């Protein structure tokens, strides 16, 4: 059965609009509770975290009601980064972890994603089973077996200590001036605290959440504010997180950006030189720049590509026994340190390289020359499928013919928003602009 509710990163949409309603969240909590409580002989628990969106309170309450109605005990973490939920699911011996977040999306959106007891995101098959339970009659627990809910006060502290342990024990950040942009999101407390405890001079940005300003003109998808802060304060480096802190972008001392591809190139090179990169292999998605692939090939390193979504990167890494992967968008996965993308830990690894090598951020952030890339997003309405239109298929075929042997074209629907993403890469920038423009025009006409 194909998934209908779950996308590439859980369930996501506009709050109080189907599917992201309180009613759905209650039933989803009950369905997930029934799925994870199949062993009736043992006590069961779920940890629930959230980012700083106003609707998080509503979904937290609804999910709690759903889980407790099936007999599961709920541990509420409050606002906390997504990777912390994955960590605490493991360390607190929970059956399941839940993060309420729409990641980098605007404040009006929200989402629900699940982690298994091992701290990894659920497989497609597990999500399909939960959807099957959701579609039927969900049997509640008997009154004496209803679950309890409890707030956990030290979740942030546990994650802070774990994050610091990923930073080399013999290093400090003394003398380093660091701008950290927390996107008014889940890391607004923990990221500045970690950097300060490691000795950095911290300049916080995006640390005043009000429920409606998450990701607004800040964070990894809008790094201009942090870039201005880096330059105006004379900072050495900037770290830009997204709303749930599972992705990161780095700014050098000039306010210039390094994306996930450049970070993966740096880490892969260093790890390979130290004998730490398993099988000399990096895992990335189809969105990563061709320049990264060429760079790794020249070094004798391998690149394995997956579908878009850090969960697919992680699945490939686990299957192949590899320990480094990520996405151009800034999800960096280091399986030696955690089970999912972690923006703060990736930022710490970049700072460690600065300190160990005695080099500036600008010297480290640019490992390879990118092949010119253009990405355009086209929004479509409910029930529309512009990629099924004959005119769009014809435009795609024509574009692929033009790019044959010169570049590549990737057309896909977003798994988290109603968008068609049109991405192309080509050394000939005039051809690149023309090809993308023609495909975008065809998609827009079909919407």
Swiss-Prot record:
Cofactors, names only: Mg(2+)
Phosphoserine PTM sites in chain numbering: 103
Cofactor notes: Binds 1 Mg(2+) ion per subunit.
EC number: 5.4.2.10
Binding site for Mg(2+): 103, 242, 244, 246
InterPro entries assigned: A-D-PHexomutase_a/b/a-I (IPR005844), A-D-PHexomutase_a/b/a-I/II/III (IPR016055), A-D-PHexomutase_a/b/a-II (IPR005845), A-D-PHexomutase_a/b/a-III (IPR005846), A-D-PHexomutase_C (IPR005843), A-D-PHexomutase_C_sf (IPR036900), A-D-PHexomutase_CS (IPR016066), Alpha-D-phosphohexomutase_SF (IPR005841)
Active site: 103
UniProt keyword annotation of Ligase present: no
Post-translational modification as stated in the protein's UniProt record: Activated by phosphorylation.
GO molecular function: magnesium ion binding; phosphoglucosamine mutase activity; phosphomannomutase activity
GO biological process: carbohydrate metabolic process; peptidoglycan biosynthetic process; UDP-N-acetylglucosamine biosynthetic process
Protein keywords: Isomerase, Magnesium, Metal-binding, Phosphoprotein
CDD domains registered for this protein in UniProt: GlmM (cd05802)
PROSITE patterns assigned: PGM_PMM (PS00710)
Reaction(s) catalysed (UniProt annotation): alpha-D-glucosamine 1-phosphate = D-glucosamine 6-phosphate
GO cellular component entries: cytosol
Function: Catalyzes the conversion of glucosamine-6-phosphate to glucosamine-1-phosphate.
Protein family (similarity comment): Belongs to the phosphohexose mutase family.
Name of the protein: Phosphoglucosamine mutase
Origin species: Dinoroseobacter shibae (strain DSM 16493 / NCIMB 14021 / DFL 12)
């Amino acid at each position: 059965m194909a998934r209908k509710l779950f996308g590439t990163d859980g369930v996501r949409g506009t709050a109080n609009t189907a599917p992201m309603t309180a009613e759905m969240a209650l039933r989803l909590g009950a369905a997930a509770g029934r799925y994870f409580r199949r062993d009736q002989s043992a006590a069961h628990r779920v940890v629930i975290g959230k980012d700083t969106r106003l609707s998080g309170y509503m979904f937290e309450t609804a999910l709690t009601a759903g889980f407790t109605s099936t007999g599961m005990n709920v541990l509420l973490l409050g606002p906390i980064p997504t990777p912390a939920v994955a960590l605490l699911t493991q360390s607190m011996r929970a059956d399941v972890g839940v993060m309420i977040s729409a990641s980098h999306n605007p404040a009006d959106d929200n989402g629900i994603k699940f982690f298994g007891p091992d701290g990894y995101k659920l497989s497609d098959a597990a999500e399909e089973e939960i959807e099957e339970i959701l579609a039927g009659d969900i049997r509640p627990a008997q009154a004496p077996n209803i679950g309890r809910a409890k707030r956990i006060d030290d979740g942030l502290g546990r994650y802070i200590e774990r994050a610091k342990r990923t930073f080399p024990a013999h290093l400090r950040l003394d003398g380093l001036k660091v701008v950290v942009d927390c996107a008014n999101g889940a890391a607004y407390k923990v990221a500045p605290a970690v950097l300060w405890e490691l000795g950095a001079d911290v300049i916080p940005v995006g640390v005043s959440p009000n429920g409606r300003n998450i990701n607004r003109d800040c964070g990894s998808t809008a790094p201009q504010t942090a870039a201005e802060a880096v330059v105006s304060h004379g900072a050495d480096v900037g770290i830009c997180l997204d709303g749930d802190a599972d992705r990161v972008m780095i700014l050098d001392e000039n306010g210039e950006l390094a994306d996930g591809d450049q970070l993966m190139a740096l880490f892969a090179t260093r790890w390979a030189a130290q004998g730490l990169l398993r099988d000399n292999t990096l895992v990335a998605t189809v969105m990563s720049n061709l320049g990264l692939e060429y760079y790794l090939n020249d070094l004798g390193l391998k690149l394995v590509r997956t579908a878009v979504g850090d969960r697919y990167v992680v699945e490939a890494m686990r299957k192949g026994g590899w320990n480094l992967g990520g996405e151009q968008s800034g999800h960096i996965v280091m399986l030696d340190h955690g089970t999912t993308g972690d923006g703060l830990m990736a930022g710490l690894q970049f700072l460690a390289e600065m300190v160990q090598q005695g080099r500036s951020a600008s010297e480290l952030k640019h490992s390879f020359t990118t092949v010119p890339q253009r990405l355009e997003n086209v929004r479509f309405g409910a029930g529309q499928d512009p990629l099924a239109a004959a005119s769009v298929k014809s435009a795609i075929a024509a574009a692929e013919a033009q790019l044959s042997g010169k570049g590549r074209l990737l057309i896909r629907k977003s798994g988290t928003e109603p968008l068609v993403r049109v991405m192309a890469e080509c050394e000939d920038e005039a051809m690149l602009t023309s090809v993308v423009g023609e495909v975008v025009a065809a998609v827009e006409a079909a919407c």
